[in-house]
Amino acid sequence: MKNSELLKIIWALKNGEIIAYPAESVFSLGCDPDNDKTIQKLLTLKNRSWEKGFILVSDNYDKLTKYIDDKKLTKFQKRIISFHDTFFPRTWVVPAKKCVSKLITGQFKSIAIRISRFEYIKNICLNYGKPIISTSANISNDAPCRTKNEVAKKFNQCVRTMNGKTLGNFQHSIVQDLLNGYLYRKR
């Protein structure tokens, strides 16, 4: 990943733009989780209901504490969140702080989070200094984009797209409730 390209992605996030970037299985769309105006643009772009909420990805646990009600988590549960597996990513559903935008949590009192070591996500979050929203690069109910060219065809000039390749995983991350173990999405 070129440093100049990463700087353009960080600039886009700081200036309220939607970005597209390679993730573990598909290209993802993302934005600043503290910018409701941009989150609303993302919902519109994807034709997605706000009620579903979004996943936040980060390179480490500490950056997520602004959004997680971690007083409801044990030390062991916090360690579980911090474990990351690049090839088999897991998204955790955890209690959200009351101040988190409903555009992120949707109709829930919880928030979906994932810590990633995947090069592109890790570098974006490390250099941006906070987590970003992560949602598959697609219109709701359509197949997700797997390449930069597919993103360009589907979203034209609506997003700033990062060069790179996904890991090629054919399955999305497992989504699991950390408190009760419920699996929302399996492999």
Swiss-Prot record:
Keyword list, A-Z: ATP-binding, Cytoplasm, Nucleotide-binding, Nucleotidyltransferase, Transferase, tRNA processing
Enzyme class: transferase
GO cellular component: a single term: cytoplasm
Gene3D superfamilies from the UniProt entry: DHBP synthase (3.90.870.10)
A GO BP entry: regulation of translational fidelity
Span of domain YrdC-like: 3-187
Compartments in which it is found: Cytoplasm
Reactions catalysed, as given in the entry: L-threonine + hydrogencarbonate + ATP = L-threonylcarbamoyladenylate + diphosphate + H2O
Any one GO MF annotation of this record: tRNA binding
Top-level taxon in the UniProt lineage: Bacteria
First-listed, main subcellular location of the protein, grouped into a coarse class: cytoplasm
EC number: 2.7.7.87
Family: Belongs to the SUA5 family. TsaC subfamily.
Function: Required for the formation of a threonylcarbamoyl group on adenosine at position 37 (t(6)A37) in tRNAs that read codons beginning with adenine. Catalyzes the conversion of L-threonine, HCO(3)(-)/CO(2) and ATP to give threonylcarbamoyl-AMP (TC-AMP) as the acyladenylate intermediate, with the release of diphosphate.
Name used for this protein in its record: Threonylcarbamoyl-AMP synthase
UniProt source species: Riesia pediculicola (strain USDA)
